[in-house]
């Protein structure tokens, strides 16, 4: 009586310890040459050794040796000679039904470019409110073209962002991030600096723009999302020794309030440039130079080589570059209008 492949002494074996198959022995994949499955697919398709060899780019003797190894692997003749060529055995016919789905799954598994447009997942990005305003208008259209089924969720950049990255609760964090701690990676996106927003007809714009003028104004500020150094972009106010500002929950609300009052708002230049295109606001440099800072992307090392994660990191960086270009163009246009 013929023995099944797993009883063949030439096949290495392991024991499946599950309750459902406690006594069943299955082949050890470490002893199986999966390339033989590609040759088997061609042999079953063409039922001719010469044609199958040509299909996979092998010589006829090499394909004959592959068939011999396949017969050993499955302990079955697989293909036998008939009056019109090779004829599959019942075992081979059964394999022919299973093989396409198995090989397609393997091809998808190892292909670095397959299925990107078919990715379906939710990606969570933690960033301050103002970074969403700057980045998402450039990022979302790019993702819509390249990975249309990936859903982007943004969250405030709260305390514990590094821990949440490690535990997989969020996928990315974006903000003022210095050197990446051990186990994390960092990519700089762009440099920014503080500028001031005032309503376009503010009386202070008719005066000398000095530290005294600036300090005499009532200030607005945006509530910081984080206390761990990742999202604090408004601490420049402290440099002037000013009294506590009127704190507003988000940047758009603050900008609308500034456009309708005599308040001044000091925010990153990219944000100021964006909101000044939507509201009647003027952008003025602070009367004292403030040190620029870098906005960076950070992620956990466990995701570093993940295909989807790599694609998203690339698209985030590309969106940041697009924003840099637009800001430069807006600044040139504003200087021309002022001249």
UniProtKB/Swiss-Prot annotation:
Which intervals hold domain HTH lysR-type? 32-89
Question: Key word DNA-binding present in the record?
Answer: yes
DNA-binding region residue numbers? 49-68
One of the entry's Gene Ontology molecular-function terms is: DNA-binding transcription factor activity
Instruction: Give yes or no: UniProt keyword DNA-binding.
Output: yes
| One Pfam family it belongs to | HTH_1
Sorted alphabetically, the keyword list is: Activator, DNA-binding, Nodulation, Plasmid, Transcription, Transcription regulation
In terms of domain of life, where is this protein from? Bacteria
Instruction: Describe its function.
Output: Acts in trans to stimulate nod gene expression.
Q: Which family does it belong to?
A: Belongs to the LysR transcriptional regulatory family.
Q: What is the official name of this protein in its record? A: HTH-type transcriptional regulator SyrM 2
Q: Which organism is it from?
A: Sinorhizobium fredii (strain NBRC 101917 / NGR234)
């Amino acid at each position: 009586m013929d023995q099944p492949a797993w009883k063949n002494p030439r096949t290495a074996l392991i024991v499946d310890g599950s309750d459902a198959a406690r006594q069943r022995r299955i082949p050890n994949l470490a002893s199986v040459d999966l390339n033989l499955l590609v040759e088997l697919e061609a042999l079953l398709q063409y039922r001719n050794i010469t044609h199958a060899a040509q299909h996979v780019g092998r010589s006829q003797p090499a394909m004959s040796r592959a068939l011999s190894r396949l017969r050993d692997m499955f302990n079955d003749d697989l293909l036998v000679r008939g009056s019109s060529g090779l004829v599959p055995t019942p075992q081979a016919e059964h394999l022919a039904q299973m093989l396409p789905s198995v090989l397609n799954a393997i091809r998808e598994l190892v292909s670095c470019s397959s299925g990107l447009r078919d990715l379906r997942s939710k990606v969570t990005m933690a960033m301050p409110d103002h970074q969403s305003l700057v980045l998402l208008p450039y990022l979302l259209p790019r993702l819509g073209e390249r990975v249309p089924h990936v859903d982007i969720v943004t969250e405030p950049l709260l305390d514990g962002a590094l821990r949440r990255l490690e535990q997989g609760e969020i996928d990315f964090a974006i903000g003022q991030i210095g050197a990446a701690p051990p186990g994390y990676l960092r990519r700089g996106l762009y440099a920014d600096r503080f500028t001031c927003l005032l309503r376009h007809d503010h009386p202070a714009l008719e005066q000398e723009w000095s530290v005294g003028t600036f300090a005499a104004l009532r200030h607005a500020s945006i509530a910081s999302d984080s206390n761990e150094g990742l999202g604090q972009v408004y601490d420049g106010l402290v440099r002037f020794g000013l009294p506590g500002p009127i704190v507003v929950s988000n940047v758009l609300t603050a900008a609308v309030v500034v456009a309708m009052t005599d308040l001044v708002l000091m925010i990153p230049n990219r944000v100021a440039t964006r909101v000044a295109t939507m509201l009647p606001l003027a952008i003025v440099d602070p009367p004292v130079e403030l040190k620029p800072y870098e906005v960076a992307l950070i992620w956990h090392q466990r995701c570093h080589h993940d295909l989807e994660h790599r694609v998203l990191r690339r698209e985030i960086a590309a969106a940041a570059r697009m924003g840099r270009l637009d800001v430069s163009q807006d600044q040139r246009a504003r200087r021309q209008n002022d001249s």
